[in-house]
Amino acid sequence: RQVAVMLETVTGPEGTGKAARVKNYRVAGKTGTSRKASAAGYASRYIASFAGFAPASDPRLVAVVIVNDPSGGEYYGGLVAAPLFSTVMEGALRLLNVPPDDYETMWVQAGQAQAKAEAEKIEPELPVSAEGVD
């Protein structure tokens, strides 16, 4: 579960894979960019990738997008492969009727967890309860 939470930050506002986001779904994943090796060393050729799953809260689908020798000047996984992942995942979630994430509940729970953590920092001796928070 902790790894899934970390992978979800990749598609967050500051993440390298934010282009992989799918509207109304939490997405988690990892971008990848690698240079191709040749007999003479590393060439100016690349492989861009994005591997991810959705919904991150209850994974139903996983996909990996690999772009061999991307053209157009961009070669980073977050810029080349992540948008393709988003398009494919959005269509697959729709076709399989996977319900969107309940964002209202998600944000309420996140707020409760943060409030509990802050309260425990201030007074660690007091029992703090936040219903529904681990």
Predicted features by range, described:
Residues 82-134:
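Short, gly/Ser/Thr-rich active-site loops of penicillin-recognizing serine hydrolases
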Residues 4-97:
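Active-site beta-strand/loop architecture of penicillin-binding DD-peptidases
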